[in-house]
């Protein structure tokens, strides 16, 4: 893809999300989502292949369906309230339809099926945008209407997403699918706390974006897409493989890494609100995520991936100048747990 066209598309994606985040008018919100969707589809298939075309088509159909449901909900709400402002959510049917539309855009269960397939079929750089930036706009809209959302429906979807995010990643060897199921699980944690403390939900989003961006940066740098290629990274640059494994454990929420902080704060907040069964089930389900991350770490660091090929290995990367650039991001993604009291005070 032409670099200038790519920059224009990225600017349009950011503009569409910014319109959604800053708008208080339903039509402008819908328009922002449409701008975002039409700009990201070419980005998903920037490296033309049948697989990327299929992934972009699946993404387009899913997002178009969600936008259609969103517009239907906006019209229903307009009929009952007579206003276009987002703050006026008086109709329960419209509220439920908007929730379903935003859940489809986020890729939460039970509308999660497109996330692993689309992520697997696109380049790593496009996957980074899909699993990080594309979550901000729907979450910002949920933040504005969270008081009007059916709490039981929301919590059910959240718990189901955490469970599916764990179960789905258990038998995966492709790192992009593992990151996709990890995204589904993390979105479940954010949704679970949205009704109780939406600020904490956005703190979780910030930590998730930092960890996911660090992981994708290392995968892009090492051209790693599977467990086999990750295990071979030891022969190229051991520090890359080591940092990748530490970030994977942080994504799994293993203390004392950064990923443990939002889970700790969310469980604490739910317990304060006299909810004990939900955080217990969430913590148990999160062990599934932690299990496949630890298994991936073990198979990569302590064993060699089985292969019958006598392949010639590259012993080092040609260019390591990018490492100092991503080192601060990796440090925050793994060692920010001591900052927890500060976030608790700000919360």
Curated annotation (Swiss-Prot):
It is a multi-pass membrane protein. It is found in: Mitochondrion inner membrane. Coiled coil: none annotated. It comes from the Eukaryota. InterPro entries: Complex_I_Subunit_2, NADH_DH_su2_C, NADH_UbQ_OxRdtase_chain2, ND/Mrp_TM. The keyword Membrane applies. The chain crosses the membrane at residues 3-23, 25-45, 59-79, 96-116, 122-142, 149-169, 201-221, 239-259, 274-294, 326-346. It catalyses: a ubiquinone + NADH + 5 H(+)(in) = a ubiquinol + NAD(+) + 4 H(+)(out). Keywords: Electron transport, Membrane, Mitochondrion, Mitochondrion inner membrane, NAD, Respiratory chain, Translocase, Transmembrane, Transmembrane helix, Transport, Ubiquinone. Core subunit of respiratory chain NADH dehydrogenase (Complex I) which is composed of 45 different subunits. Interacts with TMEM242. This is NADH-ubiquinone oxidoreductase chain 2. It comes from Crocidura hildegardeae.
